[in-house]
């Protein structure tokens, strides 16, 4: 996903970069220089067979990722870059807020690239095996865990970043909530999680079940407090 490398990390992540899913905010950051563009789009050793750019909250009439993709594909003939359609992104957004059971107008939270990648996989794969993704309760079960958020840098730890993001009531990514939704989808869509295994942590819930996560509880408390303050005033 995004700019995650394989070089020097082959023992953990392998060498395949068949598909690379990139968020629209990361796309221009990854393509600033000709060297970077060749790395992702042209070099046989490092380019992906297919680059998928998903874009959320963009102006569809002034869609800069679409322009960049056309330019890069005209320069690098081996590059294959696809953009998620407006219809697909609206569907993804509806699924996101529907699973959260929250009105979009009430918050400024957004989908992660992991969410976009999972939905891409659901669209194109018959079965899905996911490696290296922790389940919703992993951090509470491993309070001393110090694994980094990105395997290729040590800027911050995964669990601390997830927890702080989850506690932000009205903005940011909701990584643990997304993972709770993936656990719900596992049986529905044939998703299998490895390293760590999610056995014993799958929700086995119905299609209409709304997940109850740290973010959902935090948001519910916020709404109740706001309603209480409104009543008092």
Predicted features along the sequence, with ranges:
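Metal-ion/cofactor- or nucleotide/acyl-coenzyme-handling active-site neighborhoods
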Residues: 1-233
């Amino acid at each position: 996903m995004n700019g995650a490398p394989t070089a020097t990390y082959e023992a953990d992540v392998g060498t395949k970069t068949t598909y690379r899913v990139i968020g629209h905010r990361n796309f221009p950051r990854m393509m600033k220089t000709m060297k970077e563009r060749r790395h992702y789009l042209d070099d046989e050793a490092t380019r992906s067979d297919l680059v998928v750019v998903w874009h959320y909250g963009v102006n569809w009439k002034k869609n800069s990722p679409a322009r960049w993709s056309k330019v890069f594909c005209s320069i690098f003939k081996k590059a294959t870059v696809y953009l998620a359609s407006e219809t697909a992104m609206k569907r993804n957004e509806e699924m996101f807020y529907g699973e959260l059971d929250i009105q979009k107008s009430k918050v400024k939270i957004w989908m992660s690239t992991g969410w976009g990648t999972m939905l891409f996989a659901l669209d194109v794969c018959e079965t899905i095996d996911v490696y290296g993704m922790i389940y919703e309760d992993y951090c509470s079960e491993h309070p001393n865990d110090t694994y980094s958020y990105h395997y290729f840098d040590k800027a911050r730890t995964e669990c601390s970043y997830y927890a702080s993001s989850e506690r932000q009531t009205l903005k940011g990514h909701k990584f643990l909530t997304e993972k709770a939704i993936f656990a719900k989808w596992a049986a529905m869509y044939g998703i299998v999680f490895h390293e760590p295994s999610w056995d014993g942590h799958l929700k086995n819930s119905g299609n209409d079940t709304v997940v109850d996560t740290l973010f959902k509880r935090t948001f519910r408390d916020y709404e109740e407090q706001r309603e209480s303050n409104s009543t008092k005033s």
